[in-house]
C-alpha cells in the first residue's frame, strides 16, 4: 500500500509539471521573451497554415472590365482588365490617341459589313452579337472600301477580294494571334489563317515611317474630303512585344499618324480608314442588356449603332480570350 501511494503521488507531481510547462509555453515562457516562438507554438501553427491554404480563390467578372479613359497623355495607363490583368492601355502622343492590346488576354476579330464586303459565308457579320458581345472589350473601324483597289479581304477560308502581294496586311491566325506586315514579305507564316484585311502599303515598317508620308499624301494614302492633307485618320500597328496598337486622330497627315505610332512603340503598321465619317473606336462597359459604349477618340463623329447594330462597313472587334 505504501508503494502504491508513492506511485500515485509521483503521478500527480508529473501531471502538475506538464500543466505548468503548457502554461509557460502559452505565455512565451519556453521560447524566451514573451512573444517569442516556442516549440509548442511551432506545432500549433499547422492548422493556421491549413486554413490559409483553404482560402477561396478570387473570382473575376466573366467579361472585360473597362476602367474609363482617364486623362489622355503620353504615358500608357490601363483602361481594360481581363481576369484581373491589364489587357488594354491608352495613351496620346503627337495628337494621336492609341489603344494598346495584350494578345495573351484578348484577340482581334474581323467583321464583314452588310455592304462591304456584303453578305457571304462569314462567321462574323455586320454586328457584334451573342457570346462575342459578352466578351467584347473594344471595336474600331477597318480599312478603305474594297472597290478602291486598296487590297484584299478574306475570312474563314472564303475570299471577298483576292489578296495582293506586298500590301499591308492584318493577318489573324486560327490560334487567335494577329500579325501585321507586307503580304508574302514576312507574312503569312505557315500557321492556319482565320482572316486577312489588306489596306495600301505599310505605313510603318521596322519602326520607320514610309518614305511617301509627306510627298504623296492623297495618291499614296487615300483621297480626302476637300483634298485636305489633314483629316481624320486611323491605323493598326504591332510592337516588339506583339501587342496591337490602334491609333487614330480627328485631324492629321499620314506623317503625324505614323510618328504617333512610332512614338508608341509600333514596329509595323497599316493605315486603316480615313475621313471623319469612318474613323471611330469604342470601349464597352458591361452590365444588363447591351454593353454601354465609351468613345475613344476625342471629337470622333462616331458610327451609328456603335458596332452593336448592323453596320455597312467592315470593322474589327477586340474580345476576351
Mark where each language-model region is.
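Short beta-strand scaffold segments in enzyme catalytic cores
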Residues: 97-101, 168-172, 234-238, 279-283, ...
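Active-site neighborhood of phospho(di)ester-bond hydrolases with catalytic His/Asp-centered motifs
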Residues: 269-272
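Bacterial N-terminal signal peptides
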Residues: 17-26
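C-terminal regions of proteins
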Residues: 278-321
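Bacterial N-terminal signal peptides that target proteins for export
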Residues: 4-16
Amino acid at each position: 500500500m505504501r508503494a502504491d501511494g508513492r506511485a500515485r503521488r509521483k503521478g500527480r507531481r508529473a501531471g502538475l509539471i506538464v500543466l505548468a510547462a503548457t502554461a509557460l509555453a502559452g505565455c512565451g515562457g519556453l521560447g524566451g521573451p514573451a512573444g517569442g516562438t516556442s516549440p509548442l507554438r511551432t506545432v500549433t501553427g499547422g492548422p493556421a497554415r491549413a486554413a490559409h491554404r483553404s482560402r477561396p480563390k478570387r473570382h473575376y467578372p466573366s467579361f472585360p472590365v473597362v476602367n474609363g479613359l482617364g486623362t489622355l497623355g503620353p504615358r500608357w495607363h490601363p483602361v481594360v482588365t481581363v481576369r484581373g490583368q491589364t489587357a488594354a492601355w491608352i495613351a496620346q502622343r503627337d495628337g494621336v490617341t492609341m489603344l494598346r492590346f495584350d494578345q495573351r488576354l484578348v484577340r482581334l476579330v474581323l467583321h464583314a459589313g452588310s455592304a462591304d464586303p456584303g453578305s457571304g459565308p462569314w462567321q462574323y457579320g455586320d454586328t457584334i452579337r451573342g457570346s462575342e458581345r459578352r466578351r467584347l472589350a473594344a471595336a474600331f473601324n477597318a480599312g478603305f472600301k474594297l472597290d478602291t483597289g486598296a487590297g484584299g479581304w478574306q475570312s474563314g477560308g472564303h475570299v471577298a477580294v483576292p489578296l495582293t502581294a506586298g500590301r499591308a496586311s492584318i493577318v489573324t491566325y486560327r490560334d487567335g494571334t494577329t500579325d501585321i506586315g507586307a503580304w508574302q514579305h514576312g507574312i503569312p507564316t505557315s500557321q492556319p489563317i482565320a482572316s486577312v484585311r489588306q489596306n495600301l502599303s505599310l505605313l510603318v515598317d521596322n519602326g520607320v515611317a514610309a518614305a511617301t508620308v509627306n510627298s504623296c499624301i492623297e495618291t499614296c494614302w487615300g483621297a480626302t474630303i476637300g483634298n485636305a492633307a489633314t483629316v481624320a485618320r486611323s491605323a493598326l500597328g504591332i510592337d516588339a512585344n506583339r501587342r496591337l496598337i490602334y491609333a487614330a486622330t480627328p485631324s492629321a497627315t499620314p506623317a503625324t499618324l505614323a510618328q504617333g505610332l512610332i512614338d508608341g512603340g509600333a514596329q509595323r503598321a497599316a493605315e486603316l480608314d480615313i475621313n471623319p465619317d469612318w474613323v471611330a473606336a469604342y470601349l464597352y462597359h458591361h452590365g444588363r442588356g447591351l454593353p454601354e459604349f465609351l468613345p475613344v477618340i476625342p471629337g470622333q463623329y462616331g458610327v451609328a449603332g456603335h458596332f452593336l447594330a448592323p453596320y455597312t462597313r467592315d470593322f474589327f472587334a477586340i474580345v476576351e480570350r
